[in-house]
Curated annotation (Swiss-Prot):
It comes from Shewanella sp. (strain W3-18-1). Is probably a protein kinase regulator of UbiI activity which is involved in aerobic coenzyme Q (ubiquinone) biosynthesis. It comes from the Bacteria. GO terms for molecular function: ATP binding; protein kinase activity. Keywords: ATP-binding, Cell inner membrane, Cell membrane, Kinase, Membrane, Nucleotide-binding, Transferase, Transmembrane, Transmembrane helix, Ubiquinone biosynthesis. Pathway: Cofactor biosynthesis; ubiquinone biosynthesis [regulation]. GO terms for cellular component: plasma membrane. Its EC number is 2.7.-.-. The active site is at D287 (proton acceptor). This is Probable protein kinase UbiB. InterPro entries: ABC1_dom (IPR004147), Kinase-like_dom_sf (IPR011009), UbiB (IPR010232), UbiB_bact (IPR045308), UbiB_kinase (IPR050154). Pfam families: ABC1.
C-alpha cells in the first residue's frame, strides 16, 4: 500500500465519520474491535447529527467525488440491499463536475488522432458542451462533409484515479466480509466487483462506440429509437466522435408539452423498446437515466427516443431470458409455486432450498400487490421484491440481472412520468406471450431445427462412420467394464479369504492362550498357538493390495 493510497484511505474514513455513518450501522455490524477502532479516531466528530442516514450517505459520496458518486448511483438500484429511504436519496446523486481546461482536451484529442484538430475538423469549440466525471464533450464540424459532430474525450489521468479508488474499495469490502458476519449477507466484495466491471467498461470509448454502432443497427428505420451515427474511423480508447443531435431532454416535460408531444404513444414506445432490446436483440442499454435520453423535435405527434451513452450495455443468456419471461407471466397469474420453481431451476437460488418455504415467502411479499389495479402494479418493483425475497434464501445475484432490474426501474419510472395512466402490463403482456410462444411452441422447434439443418446435412455423410465408431467404442467399453468387474470379484474373493484366515488365527491364538491355564494335554496349547501364528501369516500374505477400479 503506497503513501498516496494511505492518505486517500484516511480521507475516505474521515469523511464517512464526519457524516456519522458509523452511528447508523446496526449493533451486530459493530463488534468490539470496530468500536475500539472508532474510539481511536476520537477527534473526528459527526457534524451532521440532525440529518437522516440516507441523506448523510448521499452527501458523503458527493464529497468523496466521481467514483463514489457513480457507486452511489449504482447502489440506488440495489434495493435488495438498501432500504427504500436510502435508495431514494442515492438516486438523487448527480454525475456533474466542473469541466477541465479546453486546452487540455485539445491536447488529449490530438494525441489520440495523431493529427491536429484543424486538419480534420472545423469550428472546434474549446468550451465543453457537457462535462461528467469520466469524460467531457466538445462540438465541431467535419471537414470532409460539413456535418456537426461531438467529440467525447476522457479526463486526463482519470484511469489512475479510478483504479486507486477501486483498489481501496475492494480492500475495504474484503475486510467487511472477513470481520462482519452481516457483511457476508450484504456481500460488499460482490457489489464492488460488479461496480468495477461496470466503471472500467466506461473507461474505453472505443468499446462504447462499438456498442452504439450495434444498437443503431438493431434499430435502423425504427419508429421508436434513433441512435446517432458513430464515425468509427475517429474512435479510440480515449476518444469517440459521433453525430450531433438536437433533441429535447426527456426530463423537460414543459418543452415536450409545448411542442404537442403524444405522451401516451411515447410512454408505450419506451416499454416496447425495453422488451425489444431484452428479448428480441438480447442487447439492452443499461444506463437509461434521463440525462442519456432525448426526444425528437420533429413530428411530435409521432415522437421517438434518441439514445446516447452506450458505455453500459447488458445481455442475458437464453436460459435467463426464458426464466425471466416465465417469471413475469407466473406473477400475473399469481402462480407462486411456479415462481419458486423457476428461481431454483434457473440456478438463481440453490436447489437445496426448501421449495414450500420459498413459495410461501414469495406469496407473503407479492399477494398484497394485487390489492391494486393491474395498471398501478410496478414491474420493476415486482422484480425487485422477488430478488429481495430470494436474497434471504441465498440467491446467487447475477450482475446482468441487476442491470436489467435497474433499466426496468428507469424505463417504468420514465413511462409513468410521461403518461401516469400507462398500463405497463397491458403493453408488455402481449409481447411476452408472443415471445414465449416463439420460444417453446412448434414454430420455435421448427426454427431451431431449420437453424441446425445446414450443420446436420454437412455431417450426414459421416453418420455411418460415426455409428460404427460408437459401436466399436461401446464394445470396448463393455469389455473394459467386464475386465474391471472380474478384477473386482477376484479382489473381493481374496479379501474374504484373507479375513477368514485372520479371524481363524485370532481364535486359535486366544484358545492356545486359554489352554495354558486349563488341564489340557501338554501339547494342545502349542498346537493352537502354532496353527494360529501360521494361519495369521498366511492370511496376512494373502491380503489383496489396494486397487482403484
Amino acid at each position: 500500500m503506497t503513501l498516496t493510497s494511505i492518505r486517500r484511505g484516511y480521507h475516505v474514513i474521515k469523511t464517512l465519520l464526519q457524516y456519522g455513518l458509523d452511528e447508523v450501522l446496526p449493533p451486530k455490524m459493530t463488534p468490539w474491535y470496530f468500536t475500539l477502532a472508532r474510539s481511536s479516531l476520537f477527534w473526528i466528530r459527526n457534524k451532521h447529527k440532525s440529518k437522516p442516514g440516507g441523506e448523510r450517505l448521499k452527501l458523503a459520496m458527493q464529497e468523496l467525488g466521481p467514483v463514489y458518486i457513480k457507486l452511489g448511483q449504482m447502489l440506488s438500484t440495489r434495493r435488495d440491499l438498501l432500504s427504500d429511504e436510502w435508495a431514494i436519496e442515492l438516486a438523487m446523486l448527480q454525475d456533474k463536475v466542473p469541466p477541465f481546461d479546453g486546452v487540455l482536451a485539445r491536447k488529449a484529442i490530438e494525441a489520440e488522432l495523431k493529427a491536429s484538430i484543424e486538419s480534420l475538423f472545423d469550428d472546434f469549440d474549446e468550451t465543453p458542451l457537457a462535462s461528467a466525471s469520466i469524460s467531457q464533450v466538445h462540438t465541431a464540424t467535419l471537414k470532409s462533409n460539413g456535418k456537426a459532430v461531438v467529440l467525447k474525450v476522457l479526463r486526463p489521468n482519470v484511469e489512475a484515479k479510478i483504479l486507486a479508488d477501486l483498489q481501496l474499495m475492494s480492500q475495504t469490502a474484503n475486510l467487511l466480509e472477513y470481520f462482519l458476519g452481516e457483511g457476508n449477507r450484504l456481500r460488499p466484495a460482490e457489489v464492488i466487483e460488479d461496480y468495477r466491471v461496470t466503471i472500467l467498461g466506461e473507461l474505453n470509448l472505443k468499446l462504447e462506440a462499438l456498442n452504439a454502432i450495434k444498437l443503431r443497427n438493431n434499430f435502423l428505420n425504427s419508429d421508436a429509437l434513433y441512435v446517432p451515427y458513430v464515425y468509427e474511423e475517429f474512435c479510440y480508447p480515449r476518444l469517440m466522435v459521433m453525430e450531433r443531435i438536437y433533441g429535447i431532454p426527456v426530463s423537460d416535460i414543459a418543452a415536450l408539452k409545448a411542442q404537442g408531444t403524444n405522451f401516451k404513444l411515447l410512454a408505450e414506445r419506451g416499454v416496447e423498446l425495453f422488451f425489444t432490446q431484452v428479448f428480441r436483440d438480447n442487447f439492452f442499454h443499461a444506463d437509461m437515466h434521463p440525462g442519456n435520453i432525448f426526444i425528437s423535435r420533429d413530428h411530435p405527434e409521432n415522437p421517438y427516443y434518441i439514445g446516447l451513452d452506450c458505455g453500459i450495455m447488458g445481455t442475458l443468456s437464453e436460459v435467463d431470458k426464458r426464466y425471466l419471461a416465465e417469471n413475469f407471466l407466473a406473477f400475473f397469474n399469481r402462480d407462486y409455486h411456479r415462481i419458486a420453481q423457476l428461481y431454483i431451476e434457473s440456478g438463481w437460488v440453490s436447489e437445496k432450498t426448501d421449495l414450500q418455504a420459498f413459495e410461501q415467502a414469495i406469496k407473503v411479499v407479492c399477494e398484497p400487490m394485487f390489492n391494486k389495479p393491474l395498471d398501478e402494479i410496478s414491474f420493476g418493483h415486482v422484480l425487485l421484491e422477488l430478488f429481495r425475497t430470494a436474497r434471504s434464501f441465498d440467491i446467487v445475484v447475477q450482475p446482468q440481472l441487476v442491470l436489467l432490474e435497474k433499466t426496468l426501474l428507469y424505463i417504468e419510472g420514465l413511462g409513468r412520468q410521461l403518461y401516469p395512466q400507462l398500463d405497463l402490463w397491458q403493453t408488455a403482456k402481449p409481447f411476452l406471450e408472443q415471445w414465449m410462444a416463439e420460444q417453446v411452441g412448434p414454430k420455435a422447434m421448427f426454427k431451431k431445427v431449420s437453424t441446425k439443418l445446414p450443420y446436420w446435412s454437412d455431417k450426414l455423410p459421416e453418420f455411418p462412420e460415426l455409428i460404427y465408431d460408437n459401436l466399436k467404442l461401446g464394445r470396448k467399453l463393455l469389455s473394459s467394464q467386464q475386465q474391471m468387474l472380474d478384477k473386482y470379484l477376484k479382489h473381493q474373493q481374496q479379501a474374504h479369504k484373507s479375513n477368514y484366515m485372520l479371524i481363524t488365527s485370532a481364535v486359535l491364538l486366544i484358545c492356545g492362550t486359554l489352554l495354558f491355564n486349563q488341564d489340557a494335554t501338554l501339547w494342545s496349547p502349542y498346537v493352537c498357538l502354532t496353527s494360529g501364528v501360521l494361519m495369521w501369516f498366511i492370511g496376512w500374505r494373502s491380503r489383496p493390495k489396494n486397487r482403484k477400479f
